[in-house]
Swiss-Prot record:
Name of the protein: Leucine aminopeptidase 1
Binding site for Zn(2+) 1: 185, 204, 270
Gene name as annotated: LAP1
Gene source species: Blastomyces gilchristii (strain SLH14081)
Disulfide partners: 319-323
Single GO BP term: proteolysis
Length: 385
């Protein structure tokens, strides 16, 4: 996600702390460096440049967002040539009778417990050893969630990447191959020294990670979902390397496009836990529905989901080009949407630093995101889309 407007750590303070921190030796380079160690990034449609890795972090420190499209060059992919999947979304909610009792099972305690452990890894930087360890821990929690549910056909798999940390995909088969995707990114980063300094990443995006995990747990408690009677298949994704330029999600959706996978909708949950910025601004607590670079029809339906299943309203906000993993789905022609914790300008200023800790989060607010996620997943699982 974005970089905070203030630089509270300070380079001098960061350097002083280095000796006390564990060694985070990078696993290896990302995708092959075809330009002498540089990477091709896209900051806006058609605005590309070759940069070093340090220049990537410098851009992010300045609040610039981008795709790292080096892999497209290597694989001769041309995403803009892909036809956009045309989907007509429902005009109203049809599953409130089933969803409301499920939503009552969502647990703040579960999210707190999972996030406490998830933020205890020194960093979840995608090229670090602890980034692999955190992904391994997360995958075990997802497998436990499946094993303790009645959904015997549900499964979880690694999606491997060359940089170390893998993405994770959990699948709940339905009656068709039409697929609804719920996503979050599991990696974290400290923008001062990514491979060395602590990056608890509680809000960005530990909050989204545990929010969709809790929605996944409760979704599997539905007898109709567990028995595979939903009209559509539902997948939950936890992406690696979002902070490096949406690398993990691009790899996933590129593979899906090459495999002709029928993705009908994708919702991203990135930063779901910070409400203080909104309240400090004297505004009502709300969730932020992103309106730029998203699918209009899916976004309109999400507004109905928030109104129907959440206890707080939505506000409309923008986050810019390539601002989270939903942009990768859009890039490869799939309808996508993004809901964040607030208006973009009121979102957490602690991210990408060592201060992005669990103490800054509001788990009641995260529960609202979990309700929205569960409601959307269930509604679209049974929708004719």
């Amino acid at each position: 996600m974005k970089f905070p407007s203030f630089l509270s750590l300070g380079i001098a303070a960061s350097t002083t702390a280095l000796a006390a921190l564990p060694d985070q030796k990078p696993i290896g380079d990302t995708i092959a460096d075809v330009h002498l160690g540089k990477f091709l990034i896209e900051l806006a449609p058609g605005d590309t440049r070759w940069v070093t890795e340090e220049e990537k972090w410098g851009l992010k420190r300045d609040g610039r967002k981008f795709f790292d499209i080096t892999a497209e060059v290597e694989q001769n992919l041309f995403p803009r040539a892909f036809a956009k999947t045309a989907v007509t979304f429902p005009t109203d909610l049809h599953r409130t009778v089933e969803v409301m009792p499920l939503a009552a099972q969502l647990s703040k305690d579960n999210m707190f417990s999972h996030l406490t452990t998830f933020t205890s890894f020194h960093t979840r930087y995608y090229k670090s050893e602890t980034g692999i360890q955190s992904a391994t821990w997360l995958m075990k929690q997802i497998q436990k969630t499946i094993s303790s549910s009645p959904a015997s056909n549900a499964r979880v798999e690694k999606f491997e990447h060359p940089w170390g940390q893998f993405s994770i995909i959990a699948t709940v088969p339905g009656q068709s191959n039409k697929t609804v995707v719920i996503g979050a990114h599991q990696d974290s980063i400290n923008m001062f020294l990514p491979s060395i300094l602590a990056a608890p990443g509680a809000d960005d995006d530990g909050s989204g990670t545990v929010t969709i995990l809790e929605a996944f747990r409760v979704l599997l408690q539905s007898e109709a979902i567990a028995q595979g009677n939903a009209t559509n298949t539902v997948e939950f994704h936890w992406y690696s390397a979002e902070e490096g330029g949406l690398l993990g999600s691009q790899a996933v959706f590129s593979k899906y496009k090459q495999d002709n996978k029928d993705i009908r909708a994708m919702l991203q949950q990135d930063m779901t836990g910070y409400s203080k910025g909104t309240l400090d601004a004297g505004e009502l607590e709300s969730v932020g529905v992103i309106t730029d670079f998203v699918d209009e029809g899916l976004t309109e339906f999400i507004k109905k989901v928030v109104n129907g299943y959440c206890d707080i309203p939505f506000v409309l906000t923008e986050c810019g080009y390539a601002c989270s993993d939903h942009a990768s789905a859009s890039r490869f022609g799939y309808p996508s949407a993004f809901v964040i914790e607030s208006k973009f300008e009121h979102s957490s200023q602690h991210i990408h630093t060592g201060q992005d800790t669990i103490e800054t989060l509001d788990f009641n607010h995260m529960l609202q995101h979990a309700k929205m996620t569960l409601g959307l997943a269930y509604e679209l699982a049974f929708a004719d889309i």
